[in-house]
Structures are given as structure tokens and as C-alpha cells.
């Protein structure tokens, strides 16, 4: 814990059982997928990154969703703190959006992340159980002799079955906590992410050079073109914003 009742997690997919009942400050985007995971982990309240807001306001869609479950939530601006880096959100993040429950506790746009998190310690624990996640991994193409193409809502869904395949991921294109070794769990043939608005320190595209170093072709789609947290939207709607040298070759 950074302070009593507050935990920092670079990704909402990497939480601990003892986190339940605490306020989460996470580097994850504020979309529906991440919000569902925060609710299922039984956090008291949560602060995400707004991921550039993006198409259909997907980067903050989790705020209203969590309010419906009785959870106070907010986002920091993508230009104030690196997405994928909870420590940076805590250190210099500025609140960009809040839901009604967070506002009732004194959270407001323009606040420091740390100040907002302290307000959120007074939140009531959500009573509603979040619904089960729908299918979040989709096989898009499977032709004999060709690599398979997968659409995945989260990078956490990448596994051994995707070695040598193409993965189109709804997650942001940032390395978690600034650690290049965390860019991709396996050696895929190619990977595409959401650029989350690119943001401060160009964090939203920082996986690209990290994957270059491993010889993996990688690209991002613009947050304004595809819903973050939605692999199928990456596939169907995404417009490339950046490519790494391996992909460009």
C-alpha cells in the first residue's frame, strides 16, 4: 500500500486477494473491461487512466458502469500521467473525469490523483455483483499454412497458444510500469494495440520499440478510431497510428 487503504497496480489484471476493500489506483484504461475486473476484485473505489477518451468515449466508459454497481470511480488524464504506470498516476496524475459517487465524496476534475484517492477511502463498498464477462477472445482468421489472427480484449489474455500468431489487442500500447520486458508475454508474429491517445511521454506507444528489440512486428491503432478494451473494434474499426521498424520493414 502506498498509504493506508490505497494500493497502486500498473494493471487491474494484476491484483492481489488482499486488495479487496481498498482504493485502487491503476495504470489501466477506464473502459468497460478494466472496470469489470476492478468490480470483480472487490475494490472499494478506483482511479484509472482516461486513455485519451477515444472512440465512443470508451476510455472512460467504465465510470458510468461502475456507478451502476455502486462503485465510486475516476480517471486521470492521459496527458498528465503515463498509462500503464500507477506510480506515475499517483505522482503526477490529474483527475479528468469522475462519476457521481466519486463527486459526492469530493472528487473533481483538476485534483491531484493522490488527493482524490484519499477522498475515495470514504466510499461505501459496492453491494452489486458485476455480471460475468462476455467472450473476450475471438479467432478472426485460421487458414492452413498461415498464422492465425486473434482479437483479444486484453493483453492479459495472450497465452502460449498465440506464439507465432497475430494478436489484435484492445489494450493500450504502453509497457507496464515502464518495464520493456513486460511488453508481451510470448513471442507473437505481430501485435496491434490501442495507442490510448499516445499521451505524456508517448507512453501509449511504448510497447513498439520494446517489441522491435525482440523482432516482433507491432503497431497501434488510434484511440479515436477504435474502442479501447475491445479487440474486435481494434480489428474492425482501427486505423493505424504508429508502427515499429519491424512492422515497417
Where are each of the predicted segments found?
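Residues that scaffold, gate, or flank divalent-cation-dependent active/transport sites
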Residues: 1-249
